[in-house]
Amino acid sequence: MAVGIAMLALATTLFTTLSAELAIDLHWVAHIQIFPLALAGSIAGILAWLALTLVFGRIYCSTVCPMGILQDVFARVPRLGRRRRFRNGYRYEEPRNKFRYTWLTVVVGCSVAGIALAATLFDPYSAFGRICSEILLPVWEWVCGAPVLVASWLAFGIAAATLVAVAAVAWRSGRLVCNTICPVGSTLSLVSRYALMHFDIDTDVCVNCGQCGRVCKSKCINMADHVVDASRCVVCFDCVDTCHEGAIRYTYRRKRLSVPMMQPVTPASTAMSRPSSQASPAPKAAGKPEKPQAESGVALLDRRQFFATGLVIAATPAIAAASRQRKRIEAITAKRRPLEGLKPVVPPGRRSLGNFLQKCTGCGLCVAHCPAKVLRPSAGQLGIANMLHPVLDLDASYCRYNCTRCTDVCPTGALTPLSTEEKHIFVIGKASVESANCIGCGLCVRRCPRGAISMKARKADQPGPSVLIASVDSDECIGCGACQYICPATPVKAIGVSGTDFRQ
C-alpha cells in the first residue's frame, strides 16, 4: 500500500504541479503506464509488463496504476474506525467474464477503427489525468494564488462524473471497475490467471473464519473451495495481513487448478418499503387589504406607484437613445463578414493529424502544463470520435513562440519532442484576413513573431472602414495565433488561423 500511495502522489503531482522543471522530471510516471506505452508503440515496455504479470500477477494494478490506487483509497474509507457499515465486509462474487471480455473487444475494436472516444473515456490513466487537470489543478491554482481557469466545462463535467462514479463503486464494491470495464485490467487478467506467484490457501491451517474474503476488494476469494481467482486478484496483500493463522500465502506452489472452478453465490435481496408521505395542504393566503378609494371612485396613487411612474417617464429619453445606438451598431455589424472555413488547430509536434488522433489518449497532461493556457480539450471540433483531444483556443490565448512544453510531457508519441529551433518553423496552421472586418490598427503586425504580416493599401474592390489592411505571407506564417488573439475587431475578428494537415 505504501508503494501505491507514493505512486499516486507522484502521478497527482505530475498533473497539478505549477513547476515546469518538476513536470519534466516526473514525466516517467506517465511513460510507464500501460495504455500510453501501447499507443507509443513501445513493444519492449508492453512485453516487460506482460512478463512481470506472468510472474507476479497484477502488481501493475496495485502499485503503478493511479486510478487503481485511487479506488483503494476510496474503498478503505468505510473501514476507517471499524465503522458498522463495513462490519460484514466484501463477499465473493462470480467473475463477470462475458461482460468484461466483450467490453474489452468493443474498446479495442473502436480504437482500431479510429474511434478513440471509448479508450479515451475508459483508459484508467487518461481518466485519472482528467480528474487531476480539470478538478484538482484549478483548486491548487486557487490555493497558490495563480489565475484559475477551467479549460473546458465539458471535460470538467466528464471528470467530475468519473470521480463520483469511481468513488461510489469503490466505496461499495471495491475493485469492481478494474474487473469489469477497465480495458487494462481485463487485458492483464488474461495473463495473470497463469501467474507463477499466486495466493494459495492452506486448508490444513485455515479455520474458515472468512476474514480474508471480507477484506478482498476484488471479491475473488472463494471460501467454499478455498481458492483465489488470480485473474481478478490485484496482489494487494490485504488477505495476508488479515489472516492471523497464516493460512494464506503468496507462493509459487500450486495446490489448485490454474483457473479455479467457482461456486455460484446467490446474493440476498432485501426489499425496503417506504411509507408514502402525504403533502399537507398549503395554508390559504391572507387577503390583501383593499386600496383606499377616493370619493369619486378613482384609485389613489401610493408612494411606490408615484415614484415608479416618475422613473419610467424620466428613463424614456435614455431608452430611445440606446435604441438608436443599437440600430447604428447593428448597421455596422451587418457589414462584417464572419471568418468561414477555419479548421481546428492542434498542438505542435504531431507527425500527421491521423497519427495524432490515433495516439492521443486525451489525458490532459499537455493542457495542464501549457503556460499560455491556449490548449483546451476538444468538444467536437475534431469529431465526436476524437472528443477531449487537445485543440488551441486562439481567441483565449496563443501558442508561445519559444515554448515546447506540450511536446516534452506527451507520453504517447502523439506529440514528438521539438527543440526551440524546430518549434520556430513547425507549421500548425495558416492565418487569413477578412478585409471587411479589418480596421487597420496594425496590432497583428507588431505581435507576429515571424514578421509574416504587413499592412498594405486596401484595393477598390475590398470593402472596409480603413485605408490600410493586414496582409499575411503564407510562406512565413506558422499559425501560432498571436494575430488572432490580439485582433481588436468586434464582434467578428478580422484575422483567424485555420489548422493544417486535415487530410482524411
Question: Where are the model-predicted features located?
Answer:
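Non-ligating segments of multi-cofactor redox enzymes
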Residues: M1-H226, S231-R232, D238-Q504
